[in-house]
């Protein structure tokens, strides 16, 4: 397997945690210290990578674990 290619899809379920915490995307972005545009890219799954420091800040702001917001779905072959 090439290092740049995944055999599946990594999905960010930030919307679910935002709803549970009654928090807006803008409020989360401010707490994390990134732009709303960049948070939107993460939320929509268009990001190619995420820094651990950003993931840490998101988890702290949402009071959750990484597994609460990240899901892996394998490709069906």
Q: How should each PLM-predicted stretch be described?
A:
Residues 1-23:
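A short, Lys/Arg-rich alpha-helix, primarily the initiator
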Residues 15, 26, 56:
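Residues within the helices of the helix-turn-helix
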Residues 18, 29, 59:
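The alpha-helix within a helix-turn-helix
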Residues 23-41:
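Short alpha-helical DNA-recognition segment
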Residues 46-57:
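Short, basic-rich loop-to-helix N-cap that marks the start of a DNA-contacting helix
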Residues 63-77:
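Short C-terminal boundary/hinge segments that cap the last helix of small helical domains
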